[in-house]
């Protein structure tokens, strides 16, 4: 999704994740699998709708990589043996096994954002939503992050909805492009 600053991209994306949807009166409906998204059971919404914020530090809640990767699954009540399996699989997919025992503070901004993505993907979401995830990254880290999004889509068939200013890198990868203008998707 593309659009000028202030066009409503972030507001729309946040409507798709009930736990972070803005307060206030909404016009129209946001449907997920044919039902209003706000009617989704909280656990289901947490597992099936992943969200990565713009800032690498906006969603990290623990002090160690291993804890961060497991946090969402633990909160969802996933059994410990499944948590270990899913965390190991996703760390391998992302190539971040070497970070596993590191403190979060030892990671760069690009590594933190990649960890955010891995922490969301370990939940195995049906839909991955990202709000300008590379805007605070250096060009190399941004390229690595975009490459991982392409890999997630190509190898795992992951549905991805994102806003991003690096349009020239992402437009060739998109199946559809929506334009936001004055709060409306065109």
Task: List PLM regions with ranges.
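Conserved ABC transporter NBD signature motif
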Residues: 25-35, 45
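H-loop/switch region of ABC-family ATPase nucleotide-binding domains
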Residues: 164-165
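ABC ATPase NBD coupling module
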Residues: 36-50
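Conserved ABC ATPase signature
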Residues: 103-107
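Conserved ABC ATPase "signature" region
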Residues: 81-99
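Conserved catalytic motifs of ABC-family nucleotide-binding domains
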Residues: 124
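Catalytic Walker B motif of ABC-type/P-loop ATPase nucleotide-binding domains
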Residues: 128-131
